[in-house]
Curated annotation (Swiss-Prot):
GO terms (BP aspect): cytoplasmic translation
Name of the encoding gene: rplF
PROSITE patterns: RIBOSOMAL_L6_1
Organism: Phenylobacterium zucineum (strain HLK1)
Keywords, alphabetical: Ribonucleoprotein, Ribosomal protein, RNA-binding, rRNA-binding
Family named by the database record: Belongs to the universal ribosomal protein uL6 family.
Name the record gives this protein: Large ribosomal subunit protein uL6
Length: 177
């Protein structure tokens, strides 16, 4: 069983953490994030560390302990460094371009696909076949990347589609004559 909950979350200088009941608010140079911790978990701040402990020994408390610690750590990292996800477009004529704040993609459909960024997310297209998604909320960055990938997932025969940078797409052999 994982014991990640025992590890304290280090709070770097320039980051302020406010604990109000079960709500943890983290403010940093890149922005502010808030999250409500489960009732089974107790949160306290000692100096430059955030400590989480279980209120009881239930199975749910054990599960929420490690999860809560990781989510609070993700918040601290998000407001200091931020998160970034890179997508690649593979295929003839597949390209992306910025249209104001929104992302406009040609993915082999009869029309362009436009995606507006959710609050707190920014898009960038360093190359026509590359999309960078960045923000302070790790979960929202990953969800936005998955939503864009879902528009045209990589297919197994030619490998065309939208894929994560470094993703290994399993290829299949075509029909034999």
């Amino acid at each position: 069983m994982s014991r990640i909950g025992k590890k304290a979350v280090a709070v770097p200088s320039g980051v302020t953490v406010t604990i109000d009941g079960q709500t943890v608010t983290v403010k940093g140079p890149k922005g502010q994030l808030a999250w409500t911790v489960a009732e089974e978990i107790e949160v306290r701040q000692e100096g430059a560390e955030i400590l989480l402990s279980k209120r009881d020994e239930s199975t749910r408390a054990q599960a929420m302990w490690g999860l809560s610690r990781t989510l609070v750590n993700n918040m601290v990292v998000g407001v200091t460094q931020g998160y970034e996800q890179t997508l690649e477009l593979v295929g003839v004529g597949y390209r992306a371009a910025m249209k104001g704040q929104a992302l406009s993609m040609q993915l082999g459909f009869s029309h362009d696909v436009d995606v507006a960024p959710p609050a707190g997310i920014t898009f960038a297209t360093p190359k026509q076949t590359e999309i960078k998604i960045s923000g302070i909320d790790k979960q929202l960055v990953g969800e936005t990347a998955a939503r864009i990938r879902r528009l045209r997932p990589p297919e197994p025969y030619k490998g065309k589609g939208v894929r994560y940078a470094g993703e290994n797409v399993r290829r299949k052999e075509g029909k034999k004559k």
